Amino acid sequence: MLDVNFFDELRIGLASAEDIRNWSYGEVKKPETINYRTLKPEKDGLFCEKIFGPTRDWECYCGKYKRVRFKGIICERCGVEVTRAKVRRERMGHIELAAPVTHIWYFKGVPSRLGYLLDLAPKDLEKIIYFAAYVIVGVDEELRHNELSTLEAEMQVEKKSVADQRDADLEARAQKLEADIAELEAEGAKSDVRRKVKDGGEREMRQLRDRAQRELDRLDEIWTTFTKLSVKQLIVDELLYRELVDRYGEYFTGAMGAESIQKLMENFDIDAEAENLRETIRSGKGQKKLRALKRLKVVAAFQTNQNSPMGMVLNAVPVIPPELRPMVQLDGGRFATSDLNDLYRRVINRNNRLKRLIDLGAPEIIVNNEKRMLQESVDALFDNGRRGRPVTGPGNRPLKSLSDLLKGKQGRFRQNLLGKRVDYSGRSVIVVGPQLKLHQCGLPKLMALELFKPFVMKRLVDLNHAQNIKSAKRMVERQRAQVWDVLEEVIAEHPVLLNRAPTLHRLGIQAFEPQLVEGKAIQLHPLVCEAFNADFDGDQMAVHLPLSAEAQAEARILMLSSNNILSPASGRPLAMPRLDMVTGLYHLTRLDEGAIGELAASTSDEAEQGVYSSPAEAQMAVDRGALVVQAKIKVRLTQQRPPRDIESELFPEGWNYGDGWTAETTLGRVLFNELLPADYPFVNEQMPKKRQATIINDLAERYPMIVVAQTVDKLKDAGFYWATRSGVTVSISDVLVPPEKAQIMESFEAQADQIEKKYQRGALNKTERNSALVKIWSEATDEVGKAMEAHFPDDNPIPMIVKSGAAGNMTQVRSLAGMKGLVTNPKGEFIPRPIKSSFKEGLTVLEYFINTHGARKGLADTALRTADSGYLTRRLVDVSQDVIVREVDCGTERGIVTTIAEKQADGTLIRDAHVETSTYARTLAADAVDENGNVIVERGHDLGDPAIDALLEAGITQVKVRSVLTCTTGTGVCATCYGRSMATGKLVDIGEAVGIVAAQSIGEPGTQLTMRTFHQGGVAGDDITGGLPRVQELFEARVPKGKAPIADVSGRVQLEDGDRFYKITIVPDDGGEEVVYDKLSKRQRLRVFKHDDGTERLLADGDHVEVGQQLMEGAADPHEVLRVMGPRQVQIHLVNEVQEVYRSQGVSIHDKHIEVIVRQMLRRVTIIDSGATEFLPGSLTERADFEAANRRVVAEGGEPAAGRPVLMGITKASLATDSWLSAASFQETTRVLTDAAINCRSDKLIGLKENVIIGKLIPAGTGINRYRNIQVQPTEEARAAAYAVPSYDDQYYSPDGFGQNTGAAVPLDDYGFSNDYR
């Protein structure tokens, strides 16, 4: 067998009949499968042991040879080789066909490759192949030319004889008629009898004339057909062909069926044809040129590689190994078999019948019919249903052919090669484990015992609890007491992987150290729920066990949950306190006025109250009941760093641990600060979720991951502890309906009645009435909401939960306690009748049904969205899977300019809202210099929060940063252009699969995006596509719905306003030709933008526009942007447009992820003129190849090729990849494979997918070459310690048959018995 680690590329091509016979171990001659009595394979049948190998290890068919010692002997009685049964998975057979057949992929695919090669229309090809027409295969032009005059003379003679015969017959008939009439006249017959006889005679004469004329026409047709007879000409008329063969058989040869195609190909001169086509392309125009280009692609493919076009017509059909199309006995004695066996059986039956007919010398028509049936049966075997009705099995189910085995989600590629089921795994329901550390999980004892069984058994033997593995296994199965102690020992520090489906991003699988727990549920740390998107309402998770040392190391270092605190999408922590923990911390840091023991100034009779010398003293007061943790106190702190302002005032040299200072705060906040690292400045404020998130962000930016993990763990414990003590509960009595509600409703009811009256009178139309009512009731809802918020007391748990940011928002509270307000119908429009009740008061029946209307749409939407979003992720992964960090720095000077702040009129800077996702975590491409020329941050520096703050302080508004879009690395990207990895906060490692991370980061929030198209301000009209459909539209580079024109040039606008359309003319500044945009629908509205004077208003007549500026509302067409503004601008445009959608949903994704995808969309160039290069005009080429070829040609002094960048959608870009394995496993499998085989494509195995498919280590992460070839050199001491045992190259291990003398045991049956000792 091949070892995948030893080859670097995989080529696919056409197999010739020779190849097929060489692969084969024998010919399958009979359609039989197995003998139903003995259940043994039939000889020469589809399961024959002689051809495919024995069904039992080391045992021949007749049983003469049994045992391993006869290895390799071929039994003289039954002809079966004695070997392992698994060869039945790899040995192929073949069927020798009695007549050639064409391969359906090459004839029926679009475009038809056979048709392009032979220049025949697919319709004509079909007629030839399926015996409906003859085709001329060869014409002896010379012979025909030499003897043409003789043949013409013969033809003239024949024609003359026909004409003479006709004239003679007519003469005779006319005389007979005259005689008849004369006779009748003599008898005195009536005139009508005479007329009848005359008519009869004339009719016969006319028939004679017609018959002769038909004969002459036929001779003419035969003659003209013969004189113009050319190769590849079709003759559909059977009789005409027969005549031609009879008369001029020696001048030409014709045939039908696949044989004729084979003959045409034998005489086909590829080089000459390619030359002609190139000539046509150079001189031709229009359709002719296009057709020639398409044909040249196919012809050139056969010209350049060692493929022969003969491979498209088969003389032999390979039979795949029987284990891959098995036959299994069911318990009823019946057999279940793979569909392929039925399809092969049909081929063999028809082939055998055809052989017999040919031997018998059957008439041609019968033989042809049998050949046609053979062709159809081979077609069904290769691709059932591609042509005509599919062959069906029992129950009218179409049989699965070889192509169907590869296609689709259930096909070989996606089901078995790209994802497999694994052993050492289990799954169970998850429950919360609040006592766990961040890197731990609770594993049920029984599950752990089953997963670690082999480890436990080995350890039991090592510790002499069991004599051998068998008894150890028995101990484990009976769960003896010793087993549990051993299990504890075995699982220590052996991480396990937990996975929750759907795994939408890489944090869906994380490693944990298992802790044994009772029960049968897995315990999960509460802080990792966010990453897994898990909750404890019955979710299940799968556990996997990393076995090898390498796997354990990767799990521990790369996948441990405490090393995966940051989100790979935004670089912000995901392991945040949430829900109860937030409430607890919020409660802890609250400051209550007038609480027990609060700070009070000294009076004449009382000393100062609420002043403590240390947190411990304050804690004692709490224990005594003299103080509550929310009360304001003064306390002296020595172990916590003061806030920055106090530190600069009290400790100008900087604070040192142990320096005392007094804080006016609450004990709760002191306790909170004790959870943070000691040198973190004291935080003296209340802690809602947002504030907690900021602190954890800050920690992640400034402290090592270990500290962050410990801190969030402490926060979790404190959060739960104080949440329990806060007594936050929700009961119906906490839902307080504001008493002002009735009065608010009255005033708005009155307004609504007025609108209704106006409508009744006809003063308003329906749309106006609706929008007026919507406006009134929205205001009413807001009013009620405000009244409700004001009415809730501070200590009410419901607003407390919302204000702390733990869960919910005020809109939901408003539905509970105020009023539900307006709801939408499934179209997304507001229903003008509001829901006036709150849920506490209860809805009326009508309100209930109006409310469920929108809710039901929401659920249907979510279901559709999940599927759509999953498919988007799949396409994104496919297009970006080979983007891997390949080098540290590509050395480019280029970059993109990003804005970090906006300068206001008064000179102040306002930080840009999107710094987090655009500039943050990148590398500077040029020194950031302030107005005085001082370098604030140097080129090559990483922009974290501190660096960005420094830039803002220096008054810098824009910086030039490195970007994936400008990276010059050949395949993949370089680390410097990518910047820091969002998930680790450090510069990205070499080998990181950033393409997949990007795809996951964009795809994962896909389910949160909306499906619907928004109606703008209640105006019916062109909807603006938003949400997920908009993201798909952008990534697929489709022309958007409601496309907006962009200015082709800079210049002044002339705006003409028609009834239904605008007409915009741009007069260019450079005096070029005017650009006119006609028929712009008024429903689209003009675009608002900033003008030179700084005001924002609609585009108007006489305005000045810049090149690329959008003129109307709507979305610009990315292809237009590419044409007008060039590739860099279109990339930035796409990134911004995708970000628009995600930001509108509040999803934070870093630009670099979208850039990775967009870069893949613009990787190709369309060749316009090939110059002196090998490229075909009109073909798509990788930009890198294009530039390399041009450099080479220019260096040799030739003409470089001209090309223009082309924007491809992600589906198209995935299918256009250089790797045929990756493309075939993505979509349109048969089309990709057909194309790859003709072009003899070679897959360089650069991306991840192709390596996963062939089972090689993927070239990313630790599998990248520069890490794989590392050699560990032990130091002298290590060597001395390790090699105290005898070395392996002394006389103990003589290298005889054991391969490399590694001293490893060799399985007995692999040991060559060459030096036999019997």
Curated annotation (Swiss-Prot):
This is DNA-directed RNA polymerase subunit beta'. GO terms for cellular component: DNA-directed RNA polymerase complex. DNA-dependent RNA polymerase catalyzes the transcription of DNA into RNA using the four ribonucleoside triphosphates as substrates. Belongs to the RNA polymerase beta' chain family. The RNAP catalytic core consists of 2 alpha, 1 beta, 1 beta' and 1 omega subunit. When a sigma factor is associated with the core the holoenzyme is formed, which can initiate transcription. The keyword Zinc applies. Zn(2+) 1 binds at residues 60, 62, 75, 78. Pfam families: RNA_pol_Rpb1_1 (PF04997), RNA_pol_Rpb1_2 (PF00623), RNA_pol_Rpb1_3 (PF04983), RNA_pol_Rpb1_4 (PF05000), RNA_pol_Rpb1_5 (PF04998). It is an enzyme of class 2 (transferase). Keywords: DNA-directed RNA polymerase, Magnesium, Metal-binding, Nucleotidyltransferase, Transcription, Transferase, Zinc. Zn(2+) 2 binds at residues 890, 967, 974, 977. It catalyses: RNA(n) + a ribonucleoside 5'-triphosphate = RNA(n+1) + diphosphate. InterPro entries: DNA-dir_RpoC_beta_prime, DNA-dir_RpoC_beta_prime_bact, RNA_pol_asu, RNA_pol_N, RNA_pol_Rpb1_1, RNA_pol_Rpb1_3, RNA_pol_Rpb1_3_sf, RNA_pol_Rpb1_4. Its EC number is 2.7.7.6. Binds 1 Mg(2+) ion per subunit. Disulfide bonds: none annotated. Mg(2+) binds at residues 535, 537, 539. One of its GO terms (biological process) is DNA-templated transcription.
